[in-house]
């Protein structure tokens, strides 16, 4: 599985339409999406799923009003339930010849929600649109397809992976009943080419996926992990982020893993809505070709996060995307995007 900073052919997003994901706040969300599309389209193709003809027409109006050039934006009619393509879209990997293969994991709405029939078919639609080979990973014990979400896996493109125990080993929102730590490590090796899996503890507070890695720890190159750390001991994220830091420090020089360089990002102050703590995290950035989109929250730490990411990814432009409204949907930039890696297949003529 290529790292996120490796070349993309395109970024896939799904146009927002499901009002219950942003109760009372759906209005501004399409305009945030237009800005995301504008920034990414300056660097690579943006493929947009629209749940209906009506939604496609509305998306076109908003994109045009926002000045989004249409030469690198394509819109497709594909029914969806929600917009979080990081989890419902397939994972792009390269086979031995360098050709792109889409791993179409089973999707069950994070073992939490009951409306996911359309999202479970997104992988088939994307594979057809992109004319890519699709494979459906299955359990070794014959128990059916593997349930996995892209927001739960983070790779360095060289055989290392970050995941959390909260996501896969907890008895809450169980994705694959009966699978053990060793089972997961074997399937990561088989399907994603992983040599070593680094297990962190918990994700961030407010994450309805129950422990996705992309809100807490990310690779920015093959040898560097950036971790979201809460320094205030009174904050709910403090203990869990310090535990994750200790785990990373322990493995940073372990054989087959290290040396790893560790960097940290702060969290913004708690973002609340109707008394609910939302999963606001700067770690939910998205790396496209030559640009990094970073969620911002009208917080003094926005500047710290933007500067830190700029230092860690000096060859990329860094663009902040206002995400206070977006995170009311319980996700931000990484959650809503899915990269399509560029094939390395060389066709001899």
What are the roles of these predicted feature ranges?
Residues 1-349:
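The feature marks the mature, well-folded catalytic cores of soluble enzymes
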